[in-house]
Amino acid sequence: MKFISNLLLLSEVFPYFTRGSNIKNKFQIIRSIMFGNSRIVKFTNGINYTIPISLHSLFVNLLQIERYSQIFDLKDSKIEVSFDTQNKFYLSLKLDEEDKRLLALLAYGIVDGAVFLDMEHNTKIINDKVIKIIQGNRSTIETSEGIKFFLDSIGPDSIVETYVRRIHDNYSYDLQNKIVIDAGASIGDTPLYFASKGATVYAFELTKRNYDQMLDNLQLNSSLSKQIIPVNAGVGKDGIIEYNENISKENYDGAASFVVNKYGQNSVKRKVKGMTVKTIIETYSISDVYLLKLDCKGCEYYLKKEELHNIHRLKIEYYSYLKNHKLSDLVKLLKESNFDILIFKHNPNDMGQLGNRGNIVAEKII
């Protein structure tokens, strides 16, 4: 089983071993992966990097950046990276928390067409995939909308999903002066996105870690934060709920679930207040929900038909690896509640089937 697992890890690395690669020690890397050792990568320009086996995804991110960059050089004990020779970013060889997130952000973003600007680059030429990176004592990033985040308080994948891949864009939405309930608000990326479109957002986050980072990021966006009500609570069940939180070193998005534990030895059990959608609507005296967004690792299967009466639209990231929960059951509930639905992949690079993971956009038929 371990051998097969290592083969899968190796398959993630092979695309960067093709002709034209600047990696000197390909066979040594293959051997280290197969035997479960730390990865030492040596580039032809003299840069050497040692990355622990526990940080395999970061290792792949490093290879991605080297492949797509036009500048990848060692400068003052830091790696200088540029994709366009104009905008330059610096990664410490020590890989602290900011560096890890920057590494992942650059890797995920460049694959999806992100345009990265550094702090020195002020341009009026801008598109909706621009992310400006301001490196300093506590680095920040800024989206094309002007929304800011602390670099050490982001989930790189969710930032790319929301502000590069734009998975929440929907031309039929008019969020101005509307109510959004966001279950799985993470570090504040989606609440700030919805608020920038004019919505009032009730932002529910299960984990204390993500919740605290959301509060940090809201402080950077004082105007938009007035439209956001952050709540440290799980959505789906009332009362105190026990959940499983992923505490692996590569879990930048703070993944957690009260429905299933798929994190194994990398998980820890914690407790938090839980609220059903019905309780949320009653507690906050919400009469009309324009959009219910669910990205909560299984809580979508706890929706009840009677909770959907005053909800006009849903945006659900669903998971079907859960025992006793099927995508077909969720689809049936929505259709019986008079919703028109569309199912799609939110990540075109995801090799899995739609039956396992995807997005549902639902709109009530009038």
Where are these regions (language model features)?
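Phosphate/nucleotide-binding beta-alpha loop and adjacent structural elements of enzyme active sites
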Residues: 1-366
